Amino acid sequence: MEEASSSTGSAGGAGPSVPNLPSTSEAAIGQTNLEPESIALLQSQLQEYRQKQMDLIGHFQRAQQELSVQHMHNLYAALQQQQQLQNLQTERSAVNPLLISQQHSTEDQNSGPAAPLSLANSLTNLLSSSNGNLSVPQTPTKEHHPTAPTSNRKCDLPRSNSTTISQLTKDRLKNMIANRSKGESNSQSNLMSNSVTANGNGHDNGRKLKNSNSQVNVSSPHFEPYRLPTSLANAHNLQQASEFQLRKVNSEPNLKMRIRAKLLSKGSSPVQHVQQNNSQFNFTHPQLKRSDSETSQNVPLDFMQSSSQTNLPHLMLPSPSLPNLAAAGAFHGLNLPVGQDLNAFMAVANLSPFLSLPSLLNKKLELGGLTDEGDRNGLIGSSSTSSLASNVSMGSHQYQSLLKQQIRDLVLRRKSLVREDPEGEGLAELYNGLLPQAKLQQLQALAAESGFLAKQEPTCTTGLGYDQAMVRHECCCGNNASHVENGGRIQSIWSKLIEHGHVQKCEKVTAKKASLEQLQLVHSQTYTTFFAVSPTACLKIDANSLPLKRFLQLPCGGIGVDSDTYFNDASTQTAARLAAGTLIELSSQVAEGRLKNGFACIRPPGHHAEHEQAMGFCFFNNVAVAVKVLQTKYPAQCAKIAIIDWDVHHGNGTQLSFENDPNVLYMSLHRHDKGNFFPGTGSVTEVGKNDAKGLTVNVPFSGDVMRDPEYLAAWRTVIEPVMASFCPDFIIVSAGFDACHGHPNALGGYEVTPEMFGYMTKSLLNYASGKVVLALEGGYDLKSISEAAQQCVQALIGESDDAGRLSSVALESLPNPSAVETLQKVIAIHKSYWPALHGQEAAINTTEMQWRNLKLQVQMQQQQQQQQT
């Protein structure tokens, strides 16, 4: 309780103070002789408490951000009130003294009690446009006082000038009524005069104005429209707004007003709508609908106006679906002062403060705010292009430049970000050709005018797949030290990638759970339900058909499917489905061209998982499921797929999944020891079945310890010739790093360097147009697997030549006799299936440097022969 109270107290201060909990708990454990079960329980509780602390810190940071936004709104309101008072003082100073004396005489005649003036500021500013400039309606005051004589009445205006303004108000009302009787006012001015008449009646204690034909009972201040910046009228010499947005509250008067607006707009289509020349904002009635953007109301438009009229280089215009555009950058050539011209420009263009192309599509190509989800269903065939055409042809060069810039940015963005956009449905319809042809042609015309529709190569990048939820897969005992396959594997790799800056250069793919249908492409339905949902979901299934008869009791106290593969019903299903789903998503984006290649930092591994058998830490065969999905979704782009498995253990599950598939090549470099190393499969004679004979190529090393020279010999004599002959369209690598140095003999025992894995990755980029995806399999020495993964990702990014740079010892050493014997057997068996393997025996017992020099000499001779010919 003391720790919890101290944590809460620190959260309310300047920042969260995280107590040093690990040292305290460990000291307590060390001082008492507790049972192992109690220690495990304390450790699990400690982990949960740390997670709660991190959640508390996250909530605290979000609360600080919300508080900052609230401070911004308060500052905006204070500046607004100050500007309002300054305008009132300026207006009073210009009043004719003659009007003051007339007002005194009038008030002497009507000195009785009056109703409270709740909308004094708004009424005064609304009716003070004698010189043709439309004043801005202000927010109604919240102060309401009891009925009192006029001389003692309190309001926002000083007492000294209240009589002058009252007389001025009466004069304005008389003028408006006279204009209305002559028929010079339009329908909107009639509505405005009705509202003003009602307020005038309350101010004069129930006295009705003469020549008043109709009144509107204003019983709530919510009828008052939003305040509009004065600079809009000054910039464009506009007379009066035709319609204003209502305050977005759930009050009854506002609801009635919205219903009235819908009734007024009934029967008039957007094509027949004629815009008025004397309007500031040509808002249509759908503009009154609530916005579905969370950012559209965060920053008030007038907050920019309150600052000095200078360009703000740091000012950003948030957009829900397009990259943020800096105000200084977007309007650099226009030299717009933020205080006035930007607001005026956006008003004439009929823009909301936040322009978003998917929002425009969802709004039926009318430029304005975002609409509700219900409007998106009627996107097709229910709107016209007149609104877009009229706004584009308004002579506003600034608006066209901004729109073209946003269209350009949208085209250059990856389709992956568009899919994640909450407004991307309308944009997806544009891509699928579902929008009316007229709308599509207008957008293309704007794009062609800016000259950016020329062929441009998309800027693809490397994708990374990772999710913290996969770390939570652990044994029920809670002691990760007793299990080599634990969450620290992917945590250490991810930290290494962050340390070298690779995560910042790449695009992180959103982790998704694989569906049951996707998993059933490789595994049976019962097996999928058992390990993807829960074993309890299979209680009604016949026990003979279950994939597992019973769980084993592990020495650590947990349970498992075998002596190595632990199972936890609370976390295993989620992690296993995320591992397969993340690889599917990453591979799909590479196949579609949204990413150039990728690395999936996932667990648990999968290449040992068979159709109905979990083993070797594996539950679902991630690589096999991803390949099946690619074959199903992209039969043209992924007609031929190559799987390279360089895990030190043979991928028995992957080989069984494709031993009959003539469109999938499976090649494995692994330790075999003549069948005495786990899992014991993957001999040189396993070449595939039926039409797929020769498409399973195993390089089963036995005997001596293998290092870089042996892997280089296998790569140049077997892997590269077969890959060149197969010509794959897509490559997936079972990237296990347990052949790397640092692993004990039982887990690997080989001494391959991390640079060798980078070298193999760089070599694979020469095939399949560089569409290569690596999926983490095995590897349990955290230091070596982190370095190996870093080398692979660096090679995928392709910005540095340091990736895969081998040492001189590796390049100038001969392979050991055990490797030479294995490679000779592989070539002898597979050269009947792959003619490119003929003559490769001579390249086995040479160094990598000698082989490169020999290739260079052969290439030079061929060039000389071509020149002579």
UniProtKB/Swiss-Prot annotation:
Record-listed Phosphoserine modification sites: 251
Entry comment on modification after translation: Phosphorylated by serine/threonine-protein kinase kin-29 at Ser-251; the phosphorylation inhibits repression of transcription by mef-2. May be phosphorylated by either cyclic-AMP dependent or cyclic-GMP dependent protein kinases.
SUPFAM superfamilies cross-referenced by the UniProt entry: Arginase/deacetylase (SSF52768)
Region (Disordered) location: 1-25, 128-167, 180-218
Impact when changing residue 515 to A: Localizes to cytoplasm; does not affect chemoreceptor str-1 expression
EC number: 3.5.1.98
Subcellular locations according to the entry: Nucleus
Family annotation (PANTHER family): HISTONE DEACETYLASE, HISTONE DEACETYLASE HDAC1-RELATED
Protein's name in the database: Histone deacetylase 4
Taxonomy of the source species: Eukaryota, Metazoa, Ecdysozoa, Nematoda, Chromadorea
Chain's gene name: hda-4
